[in-house]
Amino acid sequence: NKDEAMALAKRGQDVFFKIENCKKPIVAAVNGFALGGGCELTMACHFRLCSENAKFGQPEVNLGLIPGYGGTQRLTQLVGKGKSMELQMTAHLIDANEALQLGLVNHVTTAESLLERTIDILNVIMSKAPIAIGKIIECVNVAVVSDSAYTNGKSGYDKEVEAFGDCFVTEDMKEGTTAFLEKRKANFQGK
């Protein structure tokens, strides 16, 4: 019935919202098909890599449905209104190169090097200040969401000012600036 369907969609949105707003980076590595809920899951991740053989799509309209776990919103945020409408209304699948061109994925690589490339990027991110990484995630997410319940009525700029202040008083900021002045690699502790 309708109430059960709405509850299912709400639960899915809640799970994907937690992924999207996790303070630690979550990166999707897609090797094969990411359709329907799978595509919605990848879009909830902070960014996406895929192999050359990846395919993406929101084919729910073929079942008389629409994406229910935030896909109508995230796809539009990532690829723009017109292309989002087209992909959802036609159920057209796109390949890795088109996904890259549209901004749905950040990188395309071979299937053999997909995991290695993903880990390389994550290792770079892990070498940065973890509190700052979490604040970047918060600020970027506020920039693409207009829901005042999510943003607590703050603009993205307001959130950025607050997050900058939060980072400014951390031990990581002291370590980062000291390391810069001493011309050495920073050793961030997440404090």
Model-derived features with residue positions:
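CoA-thioester-processing core
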Residues: D14-N21, A29, L35-M89, L102, ...
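An acidic, glycine-rich surface segment that forms the CoA-thioester-binding/catalytic face
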Residues: N1-N31, D158
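C-terminal long alpha-helix characteristic of the crotonase
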Residues: L49-A54, A96, V105-K159, G165, ...
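A general structural signal for well-ordered alpha-helical segments in protein cores
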Residues: A5, G12, T72, K81-S84, ...
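Short, basic/aromatic-enriched C-terminal tail that caps enzymatic domains
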Residues: G176-K191
